[in-house]
Amino acid sequence: MIVNNMYNLCPKIINSVIVVGLYYGFMTALSIKPSHIFLIRALLLEKETNKNKGVAEETKKKVAATTGFIMGQFIRLISIYYGPLYVALGRPHTITILALPYLLIHLFWNTDKSFFAYDSNKLNSIRNLEIYCVFLNHFALQLLNSCILPNSTLARLVSIYMFRCNNKILFLTSSFFAWFIGQLFILNCFELVLVWIRKKNSIRSTFRNYLLRNSIFVIFLNCIFGSLLFLLSIQCLGRIPSPIPTQKLSEVSKIEQRERERLQKEEERGVEKKEQSTEEDPSLFLEEKAGWDKEKEPDYKFPDSELEILQKKKIKNQEFEKHLAALLFDYKRWTRPFRYIKNNHLEQALRNEMSQYFFDTYQSDGKNRLSFTHPISLSAFLKMIKPKIPLLLVEKNTFNSNSLDNGWVYRNKKQMNYLRIDFLNRVKNLDKAKAVALPRIEFETTRTQLCIHNDENKQEYLPENFDPLLNGPYRGRIKKGLLPINDTLSEHLRETVMLNRLHALVLLNTNSKNSNQKMSTFGKKPLEICGFSTFNLNLMDSELKTEVLVNPIETHDLNFLKKYSTIEEISKKVPRWSYKLITELEQISYYKNPPDDHDIRSRKGISVVIFDPNKEATTTNSKTNTTKDTNLETKKESESDEDKLVVIRYPQQSDFRQGLIKDSMRNQRRKIIIWELFNANVHSPLFFDRLTIVFSFPRLKQLFINLSARHVFGISKSTDKKRGKTKKEEKRENKQREQKERLEIGEAWDVFPVAQIIRGFLLLNQTFIRKKIILPSLIIGKNIGRILLFQIPEWSEDLRELNRETHIKCTYNGIPLSEKEFPENWLTEGIQIKILFPFCLKPWHPYKPQTSHYDFCFLTVWGRETEQPFGHPRKTPSFFEPVLQELDKKIVNINIKARIFSKVKINLFKRFSKEKDFQISNQIINESFQQIEEIPGCTNSSLIEKMQNMAHRTSTIKKEIERVTEEKKRVTLERYICFYKRSYRLALAKNIFKKVKVKVTKNRLICKFFFFKKLFNQRIYNNIFLETIYICRITTQLFLESTKKLIYKYIFNYERNKKRIDINKETKNKFNLISKLKTYNHCKKNSYLSCDLSNLSQAYVFYKIPQTGVLNVCKLISALQQNGIPSFIKTQIKDSFHTQGICKYELIQKKLQWPKTNQWKNWLRVNSEYDLSHILWFSLISQKQKWRNRVEQYHRSKEKYLNKRNSRGNYRLSDSKKQNVPKPVSDNYKKCYQYDLLSYKSINYAKKSASVISRSTPKGQAISYNDNMLQNIPGKIKRLYITYIPYIGKTLDRKYLIWKNIHFYLRKKVDIESWVAVNTSSDKDSTIGTYNYQLIDQIDKKEKELFSIPIRQNTEINRPNSTNSLVDWMGMNEQILNRPITNLELWFFPEFVWFFNVYKTKPWIIPSKILILNSNLSETDSKQKSETDSKQKSETDSKQKSETDSKQKSETDSKQKSETDSKQKSETDSKQKSETDSKQKSETDSKQKNNAEIQKDLDEDSTKSDKKNKKEKETELELFAKKYFLFQLRGDPTFKKSFFKNIQIYCLLLRLTNRKKMTLSCIQRRKFNLRIMPTMTNLFNVPEFLKMTGLVMDPLPLLIKTNGKFLLYQIVGISLVHKSKHQTNQTYRKRIIIRAGMTNLENNHLDVLVLENILSSRCRREFRTLICLNYKNWNGVNTNSIFCSKNCNQFWEERKPQYNEKRELIQKFLWPNYRLEDLACVNRYSFDITNGSRFSLLRFHMYLPWKIHG
């Protein structure tokens, strides 16, 4: 019980009035203020300095200081509890009046004390001015309220508690008592401190001897206190407004006057608008109407309203308004602006008069309730009006209100009694067995309602929805319309007045100014106080039909209702601003008649011009038309200023004026301090505990943790756990600190005006020094060092990387502009220089291409590189670091070998010593026991065995030495062939040398010293002499080649300039001879590894293996027999040769024979599709030499524009990279096509049983989708257009199917056969060929298709029913077939090839515009059709040209595609003709063709150049529209970073000359996202486009939502290609059945298409992961319901399957989404495989086969 009583007593004591009063009293006493500091000064210094003046004067000053301190505290305490005093002392004007004189007096007092000196009697203490000043000093400091720890919150809490507390006297007494005790406590503490100081003699002596004797210290101490007081007072003066009174609400009147002027201008221009009447609150803000022009208001309000009387009468001669105190201490705070609330609708913004913190009482439900959001103006008005209301009226109102309250209280008591009785009855009925029906509880709530009081004591109440007192001003919505009173009236109104809002909007008066506002009132707005109307209408005139829909807020439109006495209306006027403020963006967005100025301030910015369309036009006009008038030039300049595209650059500094209304008072920031150069977030010292400490000591902190935590306190575990968090925090702090420093540096350059000019010139000097002096000198020094160290120099690689480095001029914020053009006003605004692909000096270049992380950087003034502007310089990779790493590796290897050798040596010595001791012991035993009888059967067999072992050991050592010498001879012979095998041979020799040391004893080593000496000499010869000879030969060859290049280049240029049409044949032969010499030297240098293996196609390698002789195979054998190769690698190589059929396993162990063609044929016959006839083999062998010549010539060409990704990471030779001759682009596509073609056909050569074609599948077995790989390979594709897509070894991460649209022009629809006949019942030896049926008949050959190339057909070879398509599996009969080499796999993913074939046969199956998005081609445009026809004609003509014509045509304006085709075709034609025909015929034919074709080209080029000149302007504007329209979206933190990266890249590409190279590099490095950027089909001029559309550069993000359902619909449409929109031809189905050999389709199964088989290898992993984890989120994607439903319905209606089949198919399609094993898919697709074709080997089919019904 005692515990419970104590538990209940404690809250009562804590919440009691006495305890709360004591708490607030102590808090007011303990608030630290500057007066405490000066009190300590007075108590401390006066005792020491005034000893000579006497004790009485000392005590007087002390008493004056304490009394001033206590009096100031007491007045501040009273001001908390007394409102007028708090208002007087807490307002800014009070501080202005009190603080300024005090500061002046204190300043003069500390500076010149003779100012107050005068002759007076010192004995009279009243006249002593110092005592009064001490008292005034401590007293005034308290009144100024300059608190270090603010107490404004404390004052508010005290006032709230005073309002709520009942026993106020007890609260005041307790708080005063606590305050008094607190003051005494503070004074006693000061006294104790002073006494303790006096007792300490050391402190007292130092203070007296050193400080007080020095007069400078006393002066300095007084200055410190004075300056401290001055700073604190200035801090308080920061919230003081200017003491000059101005007119109230001057900014409102200015804005209204500006609005009226604008309306007058519009009326003068002929715009029919009415002047909008200013809507004002009738009950609030009387004084705000002083400067406004009042307008007439309708007389529809209550005549007896007091508020209306107060509005009509102006209060004059009010003493409190004229008084000075009222002017200074106005509680309404004149010139205080209201925050503008922007309204997006057409109406003016509402005046929100609610306050967050102001509270007052109001009467509701018979009680005084506290409102914390009471209107300030209403309470102020009540305070002003109370003194003017007579006392009798107040008593009468109170009596009436009490009488009403009594009735309300009586009803509530009655209701509570009823509820109590009902509750007791329910409790009693719970125990009864049967429940008794209880009466319903009727709870009545009585609240104040709004009603209309008539004289007949009848009150008409409003409904609850329309009553603002019940629902509040922001809760109810009123539907503006008619209230039907009865049925007849409603029917009559429906006939006479159209209730439909659309009809009403049409019939409204559109000439008035507020027509837009009338239209907007029909929309529902949440923050709108709507009116209500109750009236009876009897309209007979048709003219008034349009004026029935009433808006009660717009009172000026209701004047017509006064004519009718039957209309009664009750309305509430909403306070609105009479003007609409606009921002700067809204001012720009006006299409016609923009306003002169904006009203809301925007952020300060600097405009940077990015694109000027009229810049070039003005320069050309100035050259040609120099005689024009000056007026026209000025007009053009003004128009060009408007057409410029400008980006606003915002300075990186805080801007507190953003969003404020002009001519308004700024926010009152009372306790805000700005102590830094750049302070983004200004806040009060109240939040000091939440700030990060500026002065941190990380080293001392870490030292303290290491010493105390581990050794003293033993809390190492807790500190170790916190290290992870501290590291993350340190990283975050470092980033913030670096960003802050960067911004400070940038702002520091803006402080001085000349600094930007100096910095700009320094940056330009640094770019010149870096590009022209420093980097070339480093390259020269590096290569000279390599030559001196007998290494091959790397001039070409270094110069290539140096040329790749580009310096781009950027704006001050880092926005790239161009390489040559400077930004406008860059001297004053600043400039940045961005370096793309910065050069980094390397000791050697790696053989494998490495992706550099440093793609770009910025240049500093000191020539260093930084990642961000004004950032810290980054660490560049060291030149000597890789050299030192290699040396460290070698030293470590040598140490390891030395340790192993020492261990082996110790073991050998131990072994030899044991054998020696054993022999000696045996001899002693034999000598000592000679007389012992010999045991029969015992002989000295151990010695004989040892001798035999030693002999056998010597013989093995001799054989090994002989074998070593033979191998070393072979190594010396092949030394110049393979220079890079040196390390392997040396390692082999060292291993043999170690074996000899281990096995041979000490005596044997001495005997065999001659052999070791010979081996050592041979080693010196191989390592030093041969290497020097080889290096000299290489350097001389390089020098000779470089000189040859220069000579023949000069000859070639001379001949080309001399004869531009006819090229001399001798120069051509010379160049051919040079190429042969190059190939000969190159093959001699590198032998069989002469060319880059990465550039060879796999088809050529497979073909060359069986054609090579014994020597190459013997080299393979020697490689397999070497001891350095591990055994498991040998076995794998042998097994692979055995499986491929190149050689037998038995021959590998013995001697290899010459490989025959039969072995090659047997290997091909493993797959039945390669089982060819003898005639086909003969044709294949005949083309062998041509194929080999073409491939060799192809690889002799040097790679210039080929990307590093084409190497596929293969090993390169040292000299193969140093080639600079450009390779034709078409050869690259040949390689892609041949490699992909062979990879598809040979991917399953080892899995013979898995091949569908090589065997007959039994019934009931499913045919796998991936096994039937031949259907994915195009056999003969004749009608395709070659698009030059660069070869990319690594598949890109394609997320969306955005390729070119493919159009097929079908003249007549005829029966179309299938391309591939699949015979599943055939045996292994049966052959299945590719049947190339004539797919489309009766096609007009004169009209060219989009993807067609005219081919010179050979009727003898290309027969329609020929089956020789598989002969071209290596591309060796390309010349016979005369078809273009295409790469269809690059256009689509590998899995789309089969569907593409089906699409060509049946183009109506899949809508092409749904499957493949097309943004560049338009069928309706006739101009583009003519262009495509001209392109095709040019291509047909260019293929018949020779090599000389193609070189001449490269200088013309013809496009790049025709150039590459002509070069490729001409080279192949000329070489083949030279082999078959004689030289004379080729020369004559080429000359005749050249003369005829050049004239055609000149005519075509002239027509093309005219069209090109017309479209130059359009293409520039198209680039601008696509790339620069979204550049205004800078500064939005919610937007993605990838979008801004794309914009920066677009800015760079706009002014580059070679855009294609840079765009390809950006796309390959994935710096450029093609998904984000939009496209534009229509081309406009930029000024016209802006004028027509009225487009505004608004910083809004571009939101792109991926439509998941639409993507799924596309995939389903692809997967079900066997069904079409049209009726399926039955004959076509029968042919498929007969050809495929499928007698029973119901028993055969095929895998249904799974989503993972469609996308590319990288997209599969991402798509499968999204389906497994986020498939539920697809329900929220917005789709085109009309499109999806239409196509889906057509699909299912045309198919018409059974219900079960539909359900099974849907389950099968959705099966991956509901399997738990899909998590294994996520793990399975984590493998990173670059080749998408080989990725199918890793897939496992988890899905059940699906049966196809015919």
Swiss-Prot record:
GO terms for cellular component: chloroplast inner membrane. Residues 260-282, 617-638, 718-738, 1205-1225, 1419-1512 are annotated as: Disordered. The keyword Transport applies. Keywords: Chloroplast, Membrane, Plastid, Plastid inner membrane, Protein transport, Transmembrane, Transmembrane helix, Transport. Its main location: plastid. The keyword ATP-binding does not apply. The chain crosses the membrane at residues 12-32, 69-89, 97-117, 129-149, 177-197, 216-236. Residues 260-277, 727-738, 1420-1512 have a biased composition (Basic and acidic residues). Pfam families: Ycf1. InterPro entries: TIC214. It is a multi-pass membrane protein. GO terms for biological process: protein transport. Signal peptide: none annotated. It comes from the Eukaryota. It is found in: Plastid, Chloroplast inner membrane. Residues 617-629 have a biased composition (Low complexity). Belongs to the TIC214 family. Involved in protein precursor import into chloroplasts. May be part of an intermediate translocation complex acting as a protein-conducting channel at the inner envelope. Part of the Tic complex. This is Protein TIC 214. It comes from Cuscuta reflexa.
